[in-house]
Amino acid sequence: MKQGIHPNYHEVNVTCSCGNKFATKSAMEKENFNIEVCSLCHPFYTGTQKIVDTTGRVDKFNNKFGNLFKR
């Protein structure tokens, strides 16, 4: 490898908004890095995904405006 062309690869402390902290290696110049979502609080990994129920909205729309579009 050529000397002096590669970035400095060092340990970075990552802090999530949920309070989770972990260390990883990166070429970032910062020693500390803040993130908003990690695997402990992301809905995909926690299984707390919100499913939007649009069925009630469609029924409400059809009840309100259904007669306008019938021929």
UniProtKB/Swiss-Prot annotation:
Which prosthetic group or cofactor does it need? Zn(2+)
- UniProt binding sites for Zn(2+): 16, 18, 38, 41
Alphabetized, the UniProt keywords read: Metal-binding, Ribonucleoprotein, Ribosomal protein, RNA-binding, rRNA-binding, Zinc
Question: Which positions form S-S bridges?
Answer: none
Q: Which GO terms describe its molecular function?
A: metal ion binding; rRNA binding; structural constituent of ribosome
One Pfam family this sequence matches: Ribosomal_L31
Q: Name one GO biological process term.
A: translation
Which Gene3D superfamilies does the protein's record reference? Ribosomal protein L31
Q: GO CC annotations?
A: ribonucleoprotein complex; ribosome
- List, alphabetically, the InterPro entries matched: Ribosomal_bL28/bL31-like_sf, Ribosomal_bL31, Ribosomal_bL31_A, Ribosomal_bL31_sf
Provide the cofactor note recorded for this chain's UniProt entry: Binds 1 zinc ion per subunit.
Q: What PROSITE patterns does the record point to?
A: RIBOSOMAL_L31
Q: What family is this protein classified in?
A: Belongs to the bacterial ribosomal protein bL31 family. Type A subfamily.
Q: How does it assemble?
A: Part of the 50S ribosomal subunit.
For this protein, the record's PANTHER family field holds: 50S RIBOSOMAL PROTEIN L31, CHLOROPLASTIC, LARGE RIBOSOMAL SUBUNIT PROTEIN BL31A
Identify the HAMAP family for this entry: Ribosomal_bL31_1
Query: According to its UniProt entry, what is the function of this protein?
Result: Binds the 23S rRNA.
Q: What is the protein's given name?
A: Large ribosomal subunit protein bL31
Q: What is the lineage of its organism?
A: Bacteria, Pseudomonadati, Pseudomonadota, Betaproteobacteria, Neisseriales
Q: Which gene encodes it?
A: rpmE
